């Protein structure tokens, strides 16, 4: 499964942005001072009922990702121009819990980005295109 760094708000988190910065540091070693937060995208609900508040930030300095063992198997990059091109998204479907579900997918090389992650990226693509 391909997903963004993230998790739930901890008691010490001021808001979703603080939680996102903390989780990115914990999961891939991204120092918070290496990014400039642009803002938040519209919240998304997963098919399993989780509420996701995507936080968009610009990487200001290069860093070497250090995946947290046991939680992150691999970190990879996809060019922003590829993700913003609506032509790269497709709608697919599969049976899940007895029902047929449709979802976005945006394959990149050997990686199959789909579900909530692809839906968030598609929402970003749509918003930039407005």
List the predicted regions and their residue ranges:
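Short, His- and charge-rich active-site/binding loops that engage polyanionic ligands
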Residues: 1-9
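Unchanged
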Residues: 8-109, 113, 122-130
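NAD(P)-dependent dehydrogenases' Rossmann-like dinucleotide-binding region
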Residues: 117
């Amino acid at each position: 499964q391909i997903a963004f760094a993230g998790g739930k708000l901890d008691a010490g988190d001021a808001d979703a942005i603080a939680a996102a910065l903390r989780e990115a540091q914990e999961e891939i070693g991204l120092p918070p001072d290496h990014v400039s937060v642009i803002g938040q995208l519209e919240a998304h609900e997963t098919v399993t009922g989780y509420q996701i508040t995507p936080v968009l930030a610009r990487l200001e300095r290069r860093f070497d990702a250090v995946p947290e063992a046991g939680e992150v198997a691999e970190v990879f990059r996809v060019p922003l121009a590829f993700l913003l091109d609506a032509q790269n998204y497709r709608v697919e479907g599969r049976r899940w819990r007895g029902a047929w579900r449709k979802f976005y997918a945006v394959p990149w090389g050997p990686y199959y980005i789909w579900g909530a992650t692809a839906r968030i990226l598609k929402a970003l693509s749509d918003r930039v295109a407005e």
